[in-house]
């Protein structure tokens, strides 16, 4: 799991100054005493867990950090050179794991959503959102969204995102597209609630395998300032992954409104999700340099792996004022992961091409709020099937006031590794395996705590991992050069992550600081690697201009992480592999930004990576994958409210 930076409660209070002017310029001044004034806080975003937040139209550092194709804070990530490529993760989050194996191909996961990440809305008027960002060399990103409440009970939404970027290096053209549409309905008598959506998402990009001769980049010769002249490992290689999902969650409340005073409810809940995923690796010409080893064919190849999943969850929830909410449910999980056909290895052994079954399980969830305390606990156990799995999780939080909150929790999970660790088939000879019978479950135990205060935020995670599963790059001396094999580390890995945030304000100036310290104990195995120190510091100035018609924000952002054995990207697997030959890191990235907000439009102007102008070419996103040179980027997010 990737690290997700939680900024806590602070941004809520920063937004209030801007919220009051959010709609001034797009609405006529009220002429009647009974007219209603709306702000962005009246436009609600709702999760499938019924958590509600306001649509954010303010200009904050958080908005700038998330102005990228995957809408995430980039503190714990290093992007590859081109938009649409993958990201190196600098930290990991095990607070919520899940008990089902993932598809794999983790290099593409950033561009695919999960059902719980799709938001629903309650809007007093229709809303449109456009987001734009210039690409690398040629291309751009455009994200568009429309939502409206046709009635107070029924909301629908449509979202389309597209990205196409050429990149500076050869053979890294990227194209990403996603479409989603859905609705939510809450009956007038508040007895029936439904949320549903359809998603169709795709990633298609060329793969160049990284630099063939890294010294061409590091020496800084003038002839290689044009990055398209650098030699790359692969040509004619394309990877593609697509996802389609149908999702419905609905519930019925048996108690009439007159019996629901005090929070009493008896609910029947049902959730169904069908998802199909396909991954293709195609190659029109075989690499003569043996980057991926020997193949069964000298002509073109096209590997394919697919996953079909159908998950059903049905249960009943009892809510009582003094007992909280208790939800008991049964679950079925159908899965069919398959490759193109039965394979016979060099020893004459048959390798199955499919992992298919239906697993059954039970689960319970309990929530209770009492005088500032909030308790959340859940457990799930798959009891019949092949993959099985167990998860027990809980957290306790206490809210002192609007600006101060603490939370502590635990998560214990046992699950099978991702499907591409268990089964993979390829026309490359050394990329064929089946490990369903000999790989053990990964066992993960995490305890964590966070404090969100008016002075700053602090979080601590301590994780123990047993049977950690990874791809291991084989050394040249083994005779299997450039082969990546799945393996399990049967020892224990202890992983500590400590993150602190503090902001200092003086008049119109601000200095925001985020510092992350990490330590891993693994008996010198070097299979789980992260930088020990990562820091980001942003010095900025803010002011209103033109009689408060525009809000201006400008400054510098500095980021640095210590060197470590970063995972290497494997273009055949679309995944990352462990290597211990090359460290990356120990370089800084400074960006200049000039941002502005006019009405409900936010403009982001950035000059990225100023250090690249100094001519020291030691900046890598992953082994053999350089980070970006200095770039001038433009981004826009624009909301329209009728």
Positions of the model-derived regions?
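A generic local structural motif
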Residues: 1, 116, 590-591
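Single conserved hydrophobic/aromatic residue that forms the stacking wall/gate
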Residues: 1-16
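Glycine-centered flexibility sites
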Residues: 8-10, 167, 635
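Loop/helix-junction capping segments adjacent to catalytic residues or to phosphate/diphosphate-binding pockets
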Residues: 12, 140, 386-387
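Membrane-proximal, glycine/serine-rich, low-complexity loop/turn segments characteristic
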Residues: 17-241, 255-263, 397-403, 624-630, ...
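Short linear interaction motifs
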Residues: 111-112, 140, 230-232, 248, ...
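Exposed, low-structure sequence patches enriched in small/polar residues
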Residues: 123-125, 240-285, 299-642
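Solvent-exposed loop segments that connect transmembrane elements
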Residues: 212, 219-223, 290, 294, ...
């Amino acid at each position: 799991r990737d690290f997700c930076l939680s900024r806590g409660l602070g941004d809520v209070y920063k937004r209030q100054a801007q919220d009051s002017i959010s709609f001034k310029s797009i609405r006529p001044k009220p002429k009647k005493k009974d007219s209603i004034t709306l702000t962005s806080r009246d436009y609600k975003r709702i999760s499938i867990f019924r958590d509600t937040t306001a649509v954010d139209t303010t200009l904050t550092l958080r908005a700038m950090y998330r102005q990228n194709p995957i809408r995430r804070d980039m503190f714990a990530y290093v992007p590859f050179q081109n938009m649409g490529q993958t990201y190196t993760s600098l930290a990991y989050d095990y607070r919520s794991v899940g008990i089902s194996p993932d598809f794999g191909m983790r290099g593409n996961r950033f561009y695919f959503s999960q059902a719980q990440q799709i938001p629903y809305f309650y809007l007093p008027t229709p809303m449109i959102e456009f987001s734009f960002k210039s690409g690398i060399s040629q291309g751009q990103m455009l994200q568009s969204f429309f939502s409206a409440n046709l009635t107070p009970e029924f909301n629908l939404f449509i979202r389309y995102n597209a990205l196409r970027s050429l990149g500076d290096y050869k053979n890294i053209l990227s194209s990403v597209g996603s479409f989603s549409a859905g609705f939510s309905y809450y009956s007038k008598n508040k007895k029936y609630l439904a949320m549903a959506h359809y998603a169709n998402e795709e990633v298609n990009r060329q793969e160049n395998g990284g630099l063939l001769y890294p010294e061409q980049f590091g020496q800084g010769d003038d002839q290689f300032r044009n990055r398209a002249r650098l030699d790359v490992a692969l040509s004619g290689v394309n990877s593609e992954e697509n996802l389609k999902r149908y999702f419905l969650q609905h519930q019925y409340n048996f108690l009439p409104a007159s019996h629901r005073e005090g929070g009493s409810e008896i609910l029947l809940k049902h959730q169904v999700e069908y998802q199909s995923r396909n991954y293709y690796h195609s190659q029109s010409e075989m690499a003569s340099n043996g980057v991926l080893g020997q193949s069964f064919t000298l002509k073109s190849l096209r590997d394919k792996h697919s996953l079909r999943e159908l998950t059903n969850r049905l249960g009943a929830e009892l809510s009582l004022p003094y007992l909280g909410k208790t939800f008991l449910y049964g679950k079925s999980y159908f899965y069919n992961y398959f490759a193109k056909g039965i394979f016979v290895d060099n020893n004459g052994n048959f390798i199955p091409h499919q992992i298919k079954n239906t697993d059954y399980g039970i689960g319970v969830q309990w929530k209770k709020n009492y005088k500032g305390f909030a308790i959340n606990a859940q457990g799930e156990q798959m009891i019949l099937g092949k993959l099985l799995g167990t998860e027990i999780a809980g957290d306790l939080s206490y809210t002192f006031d609007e600006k101060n909150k603490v939370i502590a929790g635990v998560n214990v999970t046992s699950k099978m590794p991702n499907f591409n660790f268990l089964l993979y088939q390829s026309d490359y000879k050394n990329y064929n395996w089946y490990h369903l019978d000999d790989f053990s479950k990964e066992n993960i135990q995490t305890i964590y705590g966070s404090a969100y205060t008016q002075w700053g935020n602090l979080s601590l995670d301590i994780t123990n991992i047993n049977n950690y599963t990874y791809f291991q790059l084989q050394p040249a001396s083994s005779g299997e050069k450039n082969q990546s094999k799945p393996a399990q580390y049967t020892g224990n890995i202890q992983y500590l992550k400590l993150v602190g945030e503090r902001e200092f304000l003086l008049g119109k100036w601000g200095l925001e600081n985020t510092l992350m310290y990490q330590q891993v104990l693994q008996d010198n195995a070097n299979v789980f690697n992260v930088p020990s120190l990562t820091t980001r510091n942003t010095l900025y100035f803010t002011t209103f201009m033109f009689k408060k018609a525009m809000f201006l924000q400008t400054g510098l952002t500095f980021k640095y992480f210590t060197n470590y054995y970063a995972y290497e990207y494997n273009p055949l697997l679309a995944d990352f592999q462990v290597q211990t030959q090359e460290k990356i890191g120990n370089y800084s990235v400074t960006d200049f930004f000039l941002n502005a907000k006019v009405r409900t439009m936010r403009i982001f102007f950035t000059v990225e990576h100023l250090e690249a102008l100094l001519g020291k070419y030691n900046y890598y996103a992953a082994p053999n994958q350089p980070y970006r040179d200095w770039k001038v980027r433009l981004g826009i997010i624009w909301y329209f409210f009728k």
